[in-house]
A protein has these predicted regions:
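A short, well-ordered alpha-helix in the C-terminal region of glycosyltransferases
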Residues: 388, 395-409, 416-422
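Aromatic "clamp/platform" in nucleotide-sugar-dependent glycosyltransferases that forms part
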Residues: 337
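Nucleotide-activated donor-binding/catalytic signature segment of Leloir-type glycosyltransferases, i.e.
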Residues: 283, 287, 292-324
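A conserved catalytic-core segment of Leloir-type glycosyltransferases
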Residues: 11-56, 74-141, 204, 213-219
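Conserved donor-binding/catalytic core segment of Leloir-type glycosyltransferases
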Residues: 237-258, 264, 280
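Conserved acidic donor-binding segment of nucleotide-sugar-dependent glycosyltransferases
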Residues: 369-370, 374-380, 388-393
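Short hydrophobic beta-strand element within catalytic cores of glycosyltransferases
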Residues: 354-357, 367
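Short alpha-helical segment that forms part of, or immediately flanks, the ligand-binding pocket
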Residues: 323, 346-350, 364-365, 371
Length: 441
């Protein structure tokens, strides 16, 4: 077991960008991507960005660290700047009752029957009003505002005569929300000029344009870049992971929807047939998730001091450590009960790891049965697939090749950036059926 904060000291040792700013890291990053996706793709991005030159684009979410949204914005914002957009990232601030309310909203959008009091709703609106006062100089001058998830959604009502276009970006599966909570949230998002969902199946009908933009990973980020063997081995030694024995791993926030206790159950069932099996459960909390520590304690109880269960509560910036842990694993799990897109799946596939994932959300379109991994609906099903892969090394090797090729084709950051640029071109072009772009260099 490793307590919260155990890996704090790893950043300086493993992360050679510890003292660099985002702008330092991203300088001329587009040229670096050409080595991954090719010059033609970069040329398309420059061509799409030409009519957006100088446009003031503001992204608003609820945290700078922890969770997939923050990770995406850390990379998208500097890339948009390099393409000539005036891209800005702001974060709403809140207190414990605010995050309690928005966590309940988040769960309810994904189908949980959450009860939210009128007092808590009123507090949610109060915090949004306070953030409006702070952010008004930025938002009132924006050409495009992209609001991520429920936390800042109520900002819109403070801009009835706004200058720019406002877009609500929903990152979770809203296909079957708890209706009382959705009715409340809908009155805040119905006024947006458009909405973005990660998959068609996630969307709720609105009398506004709906866009589908799956998220992505950055192949050059600290979490996904290739690592030297020596660095991977240092991480392995730090957490006492035996290199001679098989390893399964799940990386995610300590959240009940990620089913970490179910992962432990699957591990124990598989271990009956593979006594040398090891499990890594690595993750942390996000600043806007008040339940993380509580769930971590539940997982500690379930692990019951098993020396082969490596339970790691990592800080939000332990990106290279997570990278190494995924590379150490033979098989990666993401046994979610509810899921948005599931970027931890994308990260694992990019590293050539077969994934055993819950048959929910965006995991369904990433984990192709018998090709990039297996979809499961129970700890027993996960254990069966773990056993299968550990005894079929050729099948694992084929899945490894398929996994990386699948992400390269579909889920890298350059594709995500292209779709955001195309969306903004479409929005500023209004009802025109044909949009002329300047020829890229």
């Amino acid at each position: 077991m490793y307590p919260q904060g155990k890996s704090e000291g790893l950043k300086g040792e493993f992360d050679n960008t510890a003292d660099k700013t985002d702008d330092d890291i991203m300088t001329k990053m587009l040229e670096q991507y050409a080595g991954v996706v090719g010059e033609e793709i970069i040329g398309h991005l420059r061509q799409l960005a030409e009519p957006l030159n100088g446009m003031r684009v503001v992204h608003i979410n609820s945290t700078r660290e922890g969770g997939g949204v923050a990770e995406i914005l850390h990379r998208l914002i500097p890339l948009k700047k390099e393409l000539g957009l005036n891209a800005i990232w702001e974060v709403v601030s809140g207190d414990a009752p605010f995050y309690q309310c928005t966590k309940k909203m988040h769960n309810a959008i994904q189908g949980d029957r959450e009860d939210i009091s009128e007092e808590l709703y009123a507090h949610y609106e109060l915090i949004n009003a306070q953030n409006h006062e702070r952010l008004e100089p930025v938002l009132s001058e924006a050409d495009v505002v992209i609001i991520h998830d429920p936390q800042p959604a109520a900002l819109l009502k403070h801009y009835p005569e706004r200058k720019g276009k406002w877009i609500w970006r929903c990152h979770v599966d809203a296909s079957n929300p708890h209706r009382p909570v959705w009715r409340y949230l809908r009155k805040h998002v119905i006024g947006y000029d458009a909405a973005i969902y990660s998959l068609p199946a996630f969307a709720q009908p609105m009398d506004k344009p709906l866009y589908i933009v799956p998220p992505s990973i950055d192949p050059l980020s600290e979490k996904n870049v290739s690592l030297p063997d020596e660095e991977i081995e240092r991480v392995r030694a730090t957490y006492d992971i035996d290199p001679e024995r098989p390893v399964i791993c799940q990386v995610s926030r300590f959240d009940r929807f990620k089913d970490p206790v179910g992962v432990i159950e699957a591990y124990r069932l598989a271990k009956k047939f593979h006594p040398d099996l090891q499990l890594i459960l690595a993750g942390g909390g996000a600043a806007d998730d008040p339940e993380g520590e509580e769930v971590f304690k539940e997982v500690e109880t379930a692990a019951a001091d098993d020396p082969d269960v490596h339970l790691l509560m990592l800080p939000p910036d332990a990106h290279r450590t997570i990278n190494a842990l995924q590379r150490i694993a033979d098989i990666v799990l993401q046994k979610s009960l509810k899921e948005g897109f599931g970027l931890t799946v994308t990260e694992a596939l990019w590293k050539g790891k077969p994934v055993i994932g819950g048959n929910v959300g965006g995991i369904r379109i990433q984990v192709v049965n018998h090709t990039t991994g297996f979809l499961v609906s129970s700890p027993e099903g996960a254990a069966l697939r773990i056993r299968y892969l550990l005894t079929h090394s050729k099948r694992m090797a084929a899945m490894s090749r398929n996994a990386k090729a699948f992400v390269t084709e579909n889920y890298l950051l350059t594709r995500h950036l292209r779709e955001y640029l195309a969306l903004m071109v479409a929005i500023i072009s209004g009802s025109r059926n044909r949009i002329e772009l300047t020829r890229g260099s």
